[in-house]
Amino acid sequence: MQKKIFITVALCLSICTVKAQKIPDSLAQDFRNFLAKNFSMYRTVNLNWETKWAHNYTFTQDGNELEKGKRRDLHKISFSTMIPVLKLKKVSLYANVQYRSYQFDAIEKTHSATSAIFSQDGYDYFAGGLNGTYYINVFNKPLTLSASVIADGWDKGFGKVQGLLSAVMIFKHTKTTTFTAGIMGMTLFSSIPIMPIISYWHRFNNPNLSVDITMPSQFYMRYQLNSHRFSAGASMTSDNFYMKPNLKNVPDICYFSEATLNPEIVYEYIINKHFYLVARAGASMVMMAGLYSDTRKGIKVRNEEGQTEVEPLVKMKRNMVPFFNLGVSYSLFK
């Protein structure tokens, strides 16, 4: 079913492209600048350190408790880079690399022993790939078509390869308002083959105040005064790494994933048009967390509405915890 959807979308887009008009020369550059300014992940280099408060957690499988414990001294260092390989008026190609290091202590509370699941005090995660974007004009509206291939792994070997396709149309792009809508599909780790993407940015009559919404991933109110920008809102993020849990009835190598919703306050000091210092503080709330097989496969279950959902092989629950993040970013684009 997923392959049929991807093929249908690809055919529709290829038909539209035949009658496409020329895209304005400045649009591709404007779009890159907008992404770099409002989305740190699209900046050329990002380096971040993050810490979370100690918290209790519980792992369950089929309703049975496997481990109840506590994680403390949590630290994460993350590095990412997007390097332009090819940048033309209508086409861009980027190579990207990500590295994350997780450090924490995990104690099983029943016997005050080292966790059987988090048996190490550190985990490394690597990912890298290529992203290509094509800028065209369809029905007098700019359209960006993107495709990515990403491979990941850890310090003990290779993980998986996944693909991502997206089509985003820019319905409005002025000095005060940008509105886009589109679709995105993934080949792995998603029970929804295709999902909508909607983004809206607007600067109010007060030129320092703006709203920045990207559904379903983030919402922010921003206030910028000279080189200082303050934001209040929320974003969805995830922490992922491969591990070897000491558990029965699960694969030897598992993929730990923790998807979170993070209400937060963000302060950015814009050193110049290329460098940013960023500080974040807020709360981390788990939406879905647990262990999957290294192929990202979970257990298919039916919810109360009768819809099929994919759950982890082993579920994890934890408390909402405060976090603090400090980082620096560099962007080639102004």
What does each of the following model-derived ranges do?
Residues 198-201, 317-334:
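Outer-membrane beta-barrel "beta-signal"
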Residues 143-155, 165, 177-187, 198-219:
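Transmembrane beta-strand segments that form the barrel wall of outer-membrane beta-barrel proteins
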Residues 88-92, 137-145, 176-181, 207-210, ...:
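Repeated loop/turn-to-beta-strand initiation elements of outer-membrane beta-barrel proteins
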